[in-house]
């Protein structure tokens, strides 16, 4: 008989409740290359030993339940159970531990981020024996990675489509995010693109509201793209948000974008859901559309240090589900992001192979093999004075997105776009000449203002603007 259906002779069924650690805490277990490995930050309830808490996480996120059941005898628990194979205290925190759990690959449906999360985090976070629980990191084995298509195109294919190399890409979120008519919205897009930006963007909550229905917005934005391309000789794009109330409506919007011939669409992957996102990513690959991903709602899940899911896990999940861009924080702007930790998950988005590095919050070595990379998008409270730091921190393979930092220019959208493009080109040239952007950044920007009145005006407006708050996302 196969191990799945084997009934164990001579083993009597004993009803009752027993400690999880007797079955699910296995410190001698040697992890397999095919296991999915998880690092959980566990805060047990008073009186619950850390080994029992870690074993409870392994049990409740795999084969276990609160009591012994007779049907355990109809399967092979050793084959299918999750195992807590390590416990370590969290430095500087009282009663917090990192519990390492290994899951057999047979527990997961191929190519389904939805199923992976339903299994690993679907139920266990409400478990009473735990005061708090946070999923810090996952190691996705190569065998599972290969069941995913991943990003529709990836970094190199995107550069080839846009014919843009050797620098970060520049974007802008159209503001005000809500309330503009479709025609005025398209006008704002055109002015930004003709001023020198590569992309403009729908904000995450621009879908199809009474003041601007999606079809009207798509048409006016497409007109703006083609007009700006004709004037500048550069390929332009606007992230047309296809997020909708149903998957069918989302696909209808993506199909219309393809018919218009625009290069890129957008999806809110957490509010829209992983199933919808993966479906859209498959369509985008099959039809030559780039896919920009917004992470709206992420801070609800990832901001608390002791409970939830760290964004590095959500970033890995997005790379598997599919997206060519994703917002990643800025380090220097108005939104959350500590430098080393942010760069840790930026590498997890872009690189093929990432070594374990606890100083950056990376708990496991991750091999993505042939899965395409994702461009990180720095967006939120950034302006021209931040350009040297952003160029130095994120490098060429990134999108730098200035919403208010473009549209807030005193002379209008197009001069705001000019200011950002001049600042970026000055920083890239200075870096290529061997200058230190971190040390000489302000001087580089001041030198560039001599040749660009638009940049000089932007520098004057935002010279005092800073967002200096302590990051919550620390090790």
UniProtKB/Swiss-Prot annotation:
One GO term describing the cellular component: chloroplast
Lineage start: Eukaryota, Viridiplantae, Streptophyta, Embryophyta, Tracheophyta
Residue numbers covered by the propeptide annotation in the UniProt entry: 1-2
Main subcellular localisation: plastid
Organism for this UniProt entry: Daucus carota (Wild carrot)
Summary of subunit composition and partner proteins: Heterohexadecamer of 8 large chains and 8 small chains; disulfide-linked. The disulfide link is formed within the large subunit homodimers.
Residues that, per the record, bind Mg(2+): 201, 203-204
Record-linked PROSITE patterns: RUBISCO_LARGE (PS00157)
Enzyme class: lyase
One Pfam family named in its UniProt record: RuBisCO_large
UniProtKB keywords: Acetylation, Calvin cycle, Carbon dioxide fixation, Chloroplast, Disulfide bond, Lyase, Magnesium, Metal-binding, Methylation, Monooxygenase, Oxidoreductase, Photorespiration, Photosynthesis, Plastid
Keyword hit for Cell membrane: no
PTM (free text): The disulfide bond which can form in the large chain dimeric partners within the hexadecamer appears to be associated with oxidative stress and protein turnover.
Cofactor(s), names only, from the UniProt record: Mg(2+)
UniProt catalytic activity: 2 (2R)-3-phosphoglycerate + 2 H(+) = D-ribulose 1,5-bisphosphate + CO2 + H2O; D-ribulose 1,5-bisphosphate + O2 = 2-phosphoglycolate + (2R)-3-phosphoglycerate + 2 H(+)
Entry annotation: catalytic residues: 175, 294
Name of the protein this chain belongs to: Ribulose bisphosphate carboxylase large chain
């Amino acid at each position: 008989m196969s191990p799945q259906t084997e009934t164990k002779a001579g083993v009597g069924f004993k009803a009752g409740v027993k400690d999880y650690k007797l079955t699910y805490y296995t410190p001698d277990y040697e992890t397999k290359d095919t296991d999915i490995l998880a690092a959980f930050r566990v805060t047990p309830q008073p009186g619950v030993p850390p080994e029992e808490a870690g074993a409870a996480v392994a049990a409740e996120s795999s084969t276990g339940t609160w009591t012994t059941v007779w049907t355990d005898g109809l399967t092979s628990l050793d084959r299918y159970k999750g195992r807590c194979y390590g416990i370590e205290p969290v430095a500087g925190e009282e009663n917090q531990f990192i519990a390492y759990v290994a899951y057999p690959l047979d527990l997961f449906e191929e190519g389904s981020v939805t199923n992976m999360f339903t299994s690993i985090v679907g139920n266990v976070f409400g478990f009473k024996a735990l005061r708090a629980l946070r999923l810090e990191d996952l190691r996705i084995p190569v065998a599972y990675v290969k069941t995913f298509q991943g990003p529709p195109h990836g970094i190199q294919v995107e550069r080839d489509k846009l014919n843009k190399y050797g620098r970060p890409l520049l974007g802008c979120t159209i503001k005000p995010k809500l309330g503009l008519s479709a025609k005025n919205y398209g006008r704002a897009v055109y002015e930004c693109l003709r001023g020198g930006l590569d992309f403009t963007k729908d904000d995450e909550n621009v879908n199809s509201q009474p003041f601007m229905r999606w079809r009207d917005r798509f048409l006016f934005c497409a007109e703006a793209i083609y007009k700006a391309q004709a004037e500048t000789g550069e390929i332009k794009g606007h992230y047309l948000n296809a997020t909708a109330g149903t998957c069918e409506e989302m696909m209808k919007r993506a199909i219309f974008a393809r018919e218009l011939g625009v290069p890129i669409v957008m999806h809110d992957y957490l509010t829209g859901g992983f199933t919808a996102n993966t479906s859209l990513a498959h369509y985008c690959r099959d039809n030559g559309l780039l896919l920009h991903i917004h992470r709206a709602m992420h801070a609800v899940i990832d901001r608390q240090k002791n409970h939830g899911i760290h964004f590095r896990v959500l970033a890995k999940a997005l790379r598997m589900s599919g997206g060519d861009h994703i917002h990643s924080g800025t380090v220097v702007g108005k939104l959350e992001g500590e430098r080393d930790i942010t760069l840790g998950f930026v590498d997890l988005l872009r690189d093929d192979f990432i070594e374990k590095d606890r100083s950056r919050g990376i708990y496991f070595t991750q091999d993505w093999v042939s899965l395409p990379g994702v461009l990180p998008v720095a967006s939120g409270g950034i302006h021209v004075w931040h350009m040297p730091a952003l160029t130095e921190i994120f490098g060429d393979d990134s999108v730098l997105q200035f919403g208010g930092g473009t549209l807030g220019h005193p002379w209008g959208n197009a001069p705001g776009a000019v200011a950002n493009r001049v600042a970026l080109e000055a920083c890239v040239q200075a870096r290529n000449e061997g200058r230190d952007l971190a040390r000489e950044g302000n001087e580089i920007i001041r030198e560039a203002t001599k040749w660009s009145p638009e940049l000089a005006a932007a520098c004057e407006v935002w010279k005092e603007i800073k967002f200096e708050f302590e990051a919550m996302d620390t090790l």
